[in-house]
Amino acid sequence: MQIKQIEGSLSAKDIRFALVVSRFNDFIGQKLVEGAIDCILRHGGSEEQITVYRCPGAFELPMVAKKVAMSGSADAVIALGVIIRGSTPHFDVIAAEATKGIAQVSLDTMIPVSFGVLTTENLEQAIERAGTKAGNKGFDAAMTAMEMVNLYRQF
């Protein structure tokens, strides 16, 4: 007996992407956006398939992601942002709530919402993960989004 295996392909063809990005730490967030767009274009997508929504901070990402997901205008949402630890507990609260909120949007709407939010100890780590030493997490989040859409389409 052969076991059936189902997985999503890495093709952006015919997928409508919504990039929801936090403006806080925008110089890094913009690199994540560029990485996500690069990924989509390299995998057969076009600029016409991409809409970028900008919100004030990481805390607002789940709200905007849910609004977009519920609108029916996107097949996948890619949440992008940067949260850098400071000297107060603010980092822990925002990182936890943004993470939980983004996951909840995907569960509530059954629209793939990929997580491309950097949570780093310092600015150097954030820069590394936005296209230098550690790749680009925006690119990675776009890969996840397209794979999940293509997986969902097989049900």
From Swiss-Prot:
GO terms for molecular function: 6,7-dimethyl-8-ribityllumazine synthase activity. Pathway: Cofactor biosynthesis; riboflavin biosynthesis; riboflavin from 2-hydroxy-3-oxobutyl phosphate and 5-amino-6-(D-ribitylamino)uracil: step 1/2. It is an enzyme of class 2 (transferase). The keyword Transferase applies. One of its GO terms (cellular component) is riboflavin synthase complex. 5-amino-6-(D-ribitylamino)uracil binds at residues 24, 58-60, 82-84, 115. One of its GO terms (biological process) is riboflavin biosynthetic process. It catalyses: (2S)-2-hydroxy-3-oxobutyl phosphate + 5-amino-6-(D-ribitylamino)uracil = 6,7-dimethyl-8-(1-D-ribityl)lumazine + phosphate + 2 H2O + H(+). (2S)-2-hydroxy-3-oxobutyl phosphate binds at residues 87-88, 129. Its EC number is 2.5.1.78. The active site is at residue 90. SUPFAM superfamilies: Lumazine synthase. Signal peptide: none annotated. Keywords: Riboflavin biosynthesis, Transferase. CDD domains: Lumazine_synthase-I (cd09209). It comes from the Bacteria. Belongs to the DMRL synthase family. Catalyzes the formation of 6,7-dimethyl-8-ribityllumazine by condensation of 5-amino-6-(D-ribitylamino)uracil with 3,4-dihydroxy-2-butanone 4-phosphate. This is the penultimate step in the biosynthesis of riboflavin. This is 6,7-dimethyl-8-ribityllumazine synthase. The gene is ribH.
